[in-house]
Amino acid sequence: SNICTAQALLANMAGFYASYHGAEGLKKIANRILRYRETLKTALKWCGIEVDESEGFDTVRFKGKNTINDFNVRYEDGWTILSLDELTTIEEILLIVHSQYMDIPFEICDMVKRYEWLSFPLRKKPWLQQEVFNKYQSETNMMRYIHELASKDFSLVNGMMPLGSCTMKLNAAAELMPVSWPEFANMHPFVPDDQTLGYQRIIFDLKEWLCDITGFADISLQPNAGSQGEYAGLLAIQKYHQSRGDFKRNVCLIPTSAHGTNPASAVMAGMKIVPVKCDDEGNIDLKDLAVKAIMNTFELSCIMITYPSTHGVFETSIKEICRIVHENGGQVYLDGANMNAQVGLAKPGNYGADVCHL
């Protein structure tokens, strides 16, 4: 569910975007981008500037100045490269041309009607013909459609969700509001560092707070889901062993009560899974753990443990579990799916965990 939640959100956004605009709306947006792109190319060429004709649908590449007022542009081997989208305006195109050639010998507005049209491969068959892409082209209809879909789901709006890892996916309205603010939403991935000081401060503070809460030395905010966090953490453990010359340590102990992503991540990281029994109450069987750890003492890489467990229980033997694994040369990977239950009460780094994802 971790990777699905993180990536399905993007897929849903793309799907609703297509449903709202429909085939004709998307074609209109695409044609506008293409028209403005060709307008810019033609204007630059009329100013005597060399333009690369090989670039694709929305990108213009030309031999020009590497600075354009109020714009960040990519500059590579003497080429200025920029891309247009549905937010591009004719005024912006005028600014770009002005930055390269001050005295434009024509009216840029006239260029929109007289740009050089190039031949592009177009779809020959109808597309987006399904009802869902032709029924919700008004804001009210789209809003009702989204609400209809949401009402089919069970969420905290309806009642309690007993699984901790799902409860954590609640985002309060106060947290969702800033997402749409341009200061957050419109930041380009390749923006210069000196224009991201606010983001850098947020990231720095967040890392410090999370390290303090968990008791760990450092944190990476790169993984986009719990499953990706597991994979990254297990690779870090493997690299740790290898840095010490322990190239044979590839056994991962996993309790039979574990979430399915645990063994999946371990296999992806190249590890061999050794299951550990649980008692009737869902707690890890310490005797079986000790036997498995000793049997694999020279190959033991780590144990993956969820705390509190998937059963919602704080295992009183957590420190003993960590001790057994450490004594046999392994590391303790804590699945932090239920971290909300221990925040402010315990720090994973203090009771023996070596790596954790949140």
Regions picked out by a protein language model, each given a short descriptive name:
Residues D52-T59, R74-T80, N224, A266:
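Short Gly/Ser/Thr- and Asp/Glu-enriched loop/turn motifs at secondary-structure junctions
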Residues S19-G25, D52-E55, L122-R123, W181-D194, ...:
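Gly-rich Lys/Arg/Thr-decorated short loops/hinges at beta-loop-alpha junctions or inter-strand turns
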Residues L44, N66-I68, G198, Q228-L358:
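Conserved PLP-enzyme active-site core in the AAT-like
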Residues S1-C47, D52-S54, V355-L358:
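Active-site C-terminal subdomain of aminotransferase-like
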Residues I90-P162, T167-A174, V179-E183:
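Flexible inter-domain linker/hinge segments
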Residues C4-L10, I81, F154-L176, Q222-G233, ...:
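Conserved phosphate/anionic-ligand binding catalytic regions in large, soluble enzymes, centered on
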Residues R32, W46-N69, L84-L87:
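Conserved PLP-binding catalytic core of the aspartate aminotransferase-like
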